[in-house]
Amino acid sequence: MLYFIPTPIGNLSDVSLHILEVLAKCEVIFCEDTRVTKKFLNLLQTRYSLKLKDVSFYSLHSHNEDEILKNIDLSIFKKICAYMSDAGMPCISDPGNSLVKFAQKNKVEYEVLSGSNALILAAVASGLVEKEFSFLGFLPNKGDERKVAIQNALNLPYPVIIYESPKRILNLIKTISGLDPQRKIFIIKEATKKFETKYFDKAINLAQILENENLNGEFCLVIDKSKNTKFETILESDILDLDIPPKPKSKLLSKITGINQKKIYKNLIK
């Protein structure tokens, strides 16, 4: 049996009784970082008197998951196993997706526990999400790839939720302000933590507000939907026409087509 266990994104009290019950019977824990997970479990033992079995820990993250899953002995899942990312819900801008696919392919019984998730928290707190929305995770870091992603996000006819780092949050808001100054944006910083802060305003105003704010922390944004009934989406042909190197071009094409990036890259450099 395999459990996917969400961990608090800032407030230890968000741990559910169900999570504690599952952890108490776990025999194997796969985790993004064993040091972070062991520290978290120590906190649970102190605060909630959690009693753990003699647990075996295995590091499983984006850099080693292919190798680990290729060589893993399926008999390990006869034990009570769990996967935990460092903070938040596994698979949501965090590792874990490959393990889900592995479980499906190999008929390993699994269950996802409910818990902390900045994406859903921001969606509810924003007041902008009623039904459909798009979650983009973290945008590309720089260059034309980032510009294309931002423009596409602003063109969508439903709210868009984005994670952003403290280093790039102001740049993102200024870029949006330059493209659509009246666009409403909700921002939550350090969700569920002691210094949680919320902002809600037009992009042009937020660009000025954030200039004078302490921007340390983790950010989640909800961008209001496009008010245009006619909107342009960047097509595959538009990306092919961009004067950018093959690598970022292959990333963009992979995102909009779903085709493997390496395959696209090989075709581009032929």
Predicted regions and their residues:
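Glycine-rich, flexible N-terminal cofactor/catalytic loop recognition
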Residues: 1-62
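A contiguous loop/helix-start segment that scaffolds small-molecule binding in enzyme catalytic cores
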Residues: 2, 55-56, 79-80, 159, ...
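Short active-site oxyanion
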Residues: 23-29, 108-110, 159-160
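Alpha-helix capping/helix-boundary segments
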Residues: 35-37, 118, 168
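Conserved helicase motor
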Residues: 58-66, 139-142
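Short amphipathic alpha-helix with an adjacent loop that forms part of the alpha/beta core around
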Residues: 68-77, 152, 207-212
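Glycine/small-residue-rich loop that forms an oxyanion/phosphate-binding "nest" at active or ligand-binding sites
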Residues: 68-117
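Class I SAM-dependent methyltransferase SAM-binding "motif I" and its flanking Rossmann-like core
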Residues: 98-156
